[in-house]
């Protein structure tokens, strides 16, 4: 392991579960990534690598999971113990946004694990009380409010399903602009032209990025997810 770098990965696993062929292959892919910090969205704990330390954002994102009680919108796996774990419990970020800290070989790191709502969240399904993009924008506001309270001496990594392609594709300009405003304090390492992109699963931080690698949402046996996954190698500024 390179003690000067931190490996961070994220993937939306499209509710892979149980002992199905897809779930087995998804779990294998997550293991092969060998990340230090792993954010899995739309997943469950049995997909995560063995060992490590796990936190999730809870079950209250406004959809009934009675028949699938192990589902989580946002899961965080860490090679090292997690502290200061907190999840949003109100608003659009409830069950979707999780913050934690860990002490890695590169030093203390804060993680913001997210599954920002997609455009139609709670519009015609779930609570049915939202308008297009309203949940997404509210969640962005909540992430911004969290970030304003962060100790700037501790590096921050934001990872998960952002539900936007960057640069903007089809989303309204106001939605793209709002995400850019929220992310302005960090560098979005996964924006632009990358293999298997453009991505909506992203990693941003105030660390330096030395590597971005993606994998597709399918393998030789078929579909794994409707998202591509991504891993970044990060290091403190001025190291190496």
Predicted regions and their residues:
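Active-site-proximal beta-strand elements of phosphoester/diester hydrolases
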Residues: 5-16, 108-129
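Active-site beta-strand/loop signature of hydrolases that rely on acidic residues for catalysis
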Residues: 7-13, 26-49, 111, 142-170, ...
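Short, solvent-exposed loop/turn segments at secondary-structure junctions
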Residues: 14-16, 44-46, 82, 116-119, ...
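Soluble or luminal CAZymes and related metallo-dependent hydrolases
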Residues: 18-25, 92-93, 131-142, 224
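Structured beta-strand-rich core segments of catalytic domains in phosphoester-bond hydrolases
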Residues: 31, 37, 42-118, 217, ...
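A short acidic, glycine-rich active-site loop
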Residues: 67, 130-138, 185, 189-190
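Surface-exposed cleft-lining segments at the edges of enzyme active sites
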Residues: 85-90, 116-139, 166
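Metal-dependent phosphoester-hydrolase catalytic domains
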Residues: 87, 149-155, 164-240
